[in-house]
Amino acid sequence: MRLPGVPLARPALLLLLPLLAPLLGTGAPAELRVRVRLPDGQVTEESLQADSDADSISLELRKPDGTLVSFTADFKKDVKVFRALILGELEKGQSQFQALCFVTQLQHNEIIPSEAMAKLRQKNPRAVRQAEEVRGLEHLHMDVAVNFSQGALLSPHLHNVCAEAVDAIYTRQEDVRFWLEQGVDSSVFEALPKASEQAELPRCRQVGDHGKPCVCRYGLSLAWYPCMLKYCHSRDRPTPYKCGIRSCQKSYSFDFYVPQRQLCLWDEDPYPG
């Protein structure tokens, strides 16, 4: 009999293959490359890496405009890091690229465990994948800066991931409180103008003077990531077993303080939501 709510095993394009794990070696980083469909319909390649020794997962994709977006989940430290490398428009006098990092608390039910990710394989590498579930837009107000020189105290991944964004690493007061309770040193965090002061500042897209401070907004999307394990039932097994993953898409919108409008030149058009 099939247990209620548990599907029968059937061929899948993405499978958990525990028998292949020994071939990789214990804890060896594993990489999976998949073709994914972006929210605007275009297709790009996404790289997913899992390191079960470090208990971390990283995801990277390039947007059609050349922006490189990455996401790192550090399960040991309860930290997730978003990074965007945004290409500048040289004809407008912008720098070659601008880097941003956003650091928030990781909830362990947001993405599958690193051990499961390391065992993920695909049967058809040419298939274009589209997320099964679209999760709602999450709007975050980043009101604290992270001190890059002390960032390793928060997560050892910060130095590599945010190396190009030394002066543009942001987090939130509520995340800071959580990490301080976990024993993270306060020297990791630096004050930005208070929320009440930032509330009085205009949005950058409303500011014409490139030297004026303002509140910048940046949006990014994780087009496809394994957010949940699937369980199947077989007549040969008394209990459900892991047999695949459920994929999700999620978008984020970050508001943060910049001392000069020049540091937020992309925030020109009205942002949805």
UniProtKB/Swiss-Prot annotation:
Residues 1-27 form the signal peptide. Keywords: Signal. The keyword RNA-binding does not apply. It comes from the Eukaryota. The keyword Cell division does not apply. Belongs to the OAF family. This is Out at first protein homolog. It comes from Homo sapiens (Human). The gene is OAF.
